[in-house]
Every structure is written in C-alpha cells, then in structure tokens.
C-alpha cells in the first residue's frame, strides 16, 4: 500500500477579503493563477471562493511537505480548478510526482480544505 499524506487548513474569509482589499491585484497574482482568479471573480461573493482556494492550496502544501518534499512550493504552483460538477481538481506544477485530491467547504465566515497526497 502506498504512503498517504494528509493536510488540512481553515481560513477566515475576512482575512482573505482584507488581503484583497489592502493589496489588490498584487496579492491575487502572488497566490492565484489567472484561471483561479477568473473562477472566483465569476461568483457572487468572490472572497468566499478565494478563501476556499487559499485553504486548498495550504492543505495541499501541508500534505506534500509531510511526505518529505523540501523544496519551496509557490502558491501558483498549485492550481485548483473545478469540474462542471463543482468538484475541485488539483493541478501541480512541481518537481514532485504524485496524485493529489482536495475537498473544499465554506460558510460566509470560514473556508476549510482537506488534501490527500500520494507520491508517485
């Protein structure tokens, strides 16, 4: 059976909303890919969706780092896309082979994500 690594992250929507309000596009470009920005901006409350994506990226980083991967992981090296069904899909642009999946949930005030990473 392969090793399985798990990561979880919880984000306050107000913190992400403040980061966007205070640093604007600079923050968005450092954390989110263009595709992620387009997705979040298409929603009625973008901050909630940015928060979910942020939590997902953090959860993925934690799962990958717990596998022993030591290189820095830029936020934009982890892209969270959505299938037509709404299911999130993780795209990794790292020098690390493996399979990663994530689950995201949110309320008006918080977003949470859990990730599973299986090295390849």
For every predicted segment, state its role.
Residues 1-120:
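Core catalytic alpha/beta fold that binds nucleotide/phospho-ligands
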């Amino acid at each position: 059976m392969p090793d399985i690594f798990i990561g979880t992250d919880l984000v306050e929507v107000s913190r992400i909303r403040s980061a966007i309000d205070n640093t604007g596009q600079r923050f968005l470009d450092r954390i989110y890919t263009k595709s992620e920005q387009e997705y979040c901006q298409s929603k009625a409350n973008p901050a909630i969706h940015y928060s979910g994506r942020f939590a997902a990226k953090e959860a993925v980083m934690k799962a990958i780092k717990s596998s022993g991967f030591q290189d820095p992981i830029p936020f934009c090296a982890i892209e969270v896309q959505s299938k037509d069904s709404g299911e999130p899909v993780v795209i990794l642009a790292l020098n690390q082979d493996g399979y990663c999946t994530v689950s995201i949930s949110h309320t008006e005030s918080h977003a949470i994500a859990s990730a599973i990473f299986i090295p390849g």
